[in-house]
Amino acid sequence: MSKWIPVLVIDDDEIIREALKRSLKLYGFEAYTAENGLSGVNLARQKKPVFILLDWIMPEMDGLEVLSELKHDKRTEDIPVFMLTDRGMIGDLDLAFEIGADNYITKPFDLMQLGKIVKTKWEKYTKPAKVG
């Protein structure tokens, strides 16, 4: 890829943030990182990433609060958000989808596999719709 594609990783775990940043770079993404929900929302407004990978469980402002804030803001409402979670309960996932999550990825995950998933999903979102 000739140009880095901006994505945002919001996770309170520094090891996960840095690992995702390195993994995503292998697939042509430039990952901006935020260590908490508030800084993540602000960074999303500033950088306009093409994707957001959002941890569900964080202190102060959890992933669902961040998701709600992003989806109720004209500047960020159209950015696809993938929840990173170890919560596999159907009710939890339904709530995330109701708020506006586009997909979810369960922890633990393989970093290389995650990079491939994000690249594939990004290509799907950016492909022009077939007409007729």
Residue spans for each PLM region:
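Receiver (REC) domain active-site loop signature in two-component systems and cognate sites
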Residues: M58
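C-terminal output helix
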Residues: F109-V118
